[in-house]
């Protein structure tokens, strides 16, 4: 039974690493925990900080998710004639399509990881 529990615990840890996503913070971080991620991109500069599979954290990097950090929420339709995608307003926090987590404001005291918290 102990072996089964240990096997399950190892599986959960491996699965959580394999499903790590990206976190985008559209502002600055103040008193935040150090980012836990494979890569951290701050102001467009990339730093390799963690292990493979831990996701990527973007801080104050507008190119991280094209269109996500500009203006109000706007979704273009099939006949819209504009570029695809969606835009999210200042202050938006939540998951984007594909599992990326967007925190479109400054982070104060945030715990940041590529797992999306």
Curated annotation (Swiss-Prot):
Pfam families given in the database record: DIM
Signal sequence interval, chain numbering: 1-20
Keywords: Disulfide bond, Immunity, Innate immunity, Secreted, Signal
Induction of expression: By bacterial infection (at protein level). Detected within 24 hours of infection (at protein level).
Keyword tRNA-binding among UniProt keywords: no
GO CC, any one term: extracellular region
Known tissue expression: Hemolymph (at protein level).
Keyword Signal: yes
Record GO biological process: antibacterial humoral response; defense response to Gram-positive bacterium; innate immune response; response to bacterium; response to mycotoxin
Highest taxon, organism lineage: Eukaryota
Chief place of localization: secreted
Compartment(s) where it occurs, according to its Swiss-Prot or TrEMBL record: Secreted
InterPro entries: Bomanin
Disulfide cysteine pairs (residue numbers): 29-32, 107-110
Note: Not induced after bacterial challenge in strains carrying a loss-of-function mutation for Toll. Constitutively expressed in Toll gain-of-function mutants.
Role, per record: Secreted immune-induced peptide induced by Toll signaling. Has a role in resistance to bacterial and fungal infections.
Family membership noted in the UniProt record: Belongs to the bomanin family.
Protein's recorded name: Bomanin Bicipital 1
């Amino acid at each position: 039974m102990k072996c089964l529990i240990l096997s399950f615990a190892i599986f959960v840890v491996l699965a959580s690493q394999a499903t790590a996503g990206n976190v985008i913070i559209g502002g600055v971080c103040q008193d935040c925990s150090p980012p836990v991620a494979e890569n951290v991109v701050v102001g467009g500069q990339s730093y390799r900080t963690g292990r493979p599979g831990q996701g990527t954290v973007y801080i104050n990097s507008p190119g991280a998710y094209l269109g996500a950090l500009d203006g109000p929420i706007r979704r273009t339709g099939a006949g819209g004639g504009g570029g695809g995608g969606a835009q999210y307003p200042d202050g938006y926090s939540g998951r984007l399509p594909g599992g990326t987590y967007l925190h479109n404001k400054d982070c104060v005291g945030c715990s940041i990881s590529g797992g999306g918290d």
